[in-house]
């Protein structure tokens, strides 16, 4: 998530509450957020370099670092590849430098938009003690066009997400 959390115009949900929303058709027309377009390989190389430098320092200081998912988890926004948009990307992250200090932030709404089984992802990261922070957010729609919803909207079974050890 090198630049921001991306949203387009808000939409209305239950009770006429205004909610944040995203439409990839609109967002793809936004200008570059940085000086140029970057490649996914460049972004991974830079991230790996940073993780290998910062994680040992975090270990020495007793700090745990958690990477936020790309929100929304689409391939490119503003000319920047969005690395953390899949289960495989997060697996790759924690393998760069295996350490208790190298972990993730688990945003349920964002992970539910990825093309992977969210419950399998939760189980995987819980077993490895890699989840530092959980955000309870529910969304309706698909990754390229969604809106945030109330947590109790049941697009995602929030109760089931607590059932992992």
Residues covered by each model-derived region:
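Hydrophobic transmembrane alpha-helix bundles
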Residues: 28-37, 100-112, 139-149
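Glycan-recognition surfaces
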Residues: 15-17, 107, 130
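Active-site acidic/histidine proton-transfer and metal-coordination neighborhood
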Residues: 1-103
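Hydrophobic faces of well-ordered beta-strands that scaffold small-molecule active sites
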Residues: 65-67, 102-108, 132-136
């Amino acid at each position: 998530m090198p630049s921001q959390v991306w949203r387009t115009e808000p939409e209305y949900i239950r009770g006429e509450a205004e909610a944040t929303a995203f439409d990839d058709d609109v967002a793809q027309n936004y200008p570059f957020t940085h000086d140029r377009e970057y490649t996914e390989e460049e972004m991974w190389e830079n991230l790996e370099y940073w993780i290998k430098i910062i994680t040992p320092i975090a270990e020495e200081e007793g700090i745990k670092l958690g990477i936020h998912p790309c929100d929304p988890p689409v391939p490119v926004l503003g000319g920047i590849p969005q690395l953390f948009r899949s289960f495989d990307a997060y697996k790759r992250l924690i393998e760069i430098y295996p350490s208790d200090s190298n972990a993730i932030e688990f945003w349920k709404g964002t992970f539910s938009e990825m093309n992977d089984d969210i419950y399998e992802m939760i189980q995987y990261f819980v077993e490895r003690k890699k989840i530092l922070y959980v955000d309870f957010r529910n969304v309706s729609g698909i990754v390229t066009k969604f809106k945030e919803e109330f947590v109790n909207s049941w697009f995602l079974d929030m109760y089931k997400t607590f059932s992992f050890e």
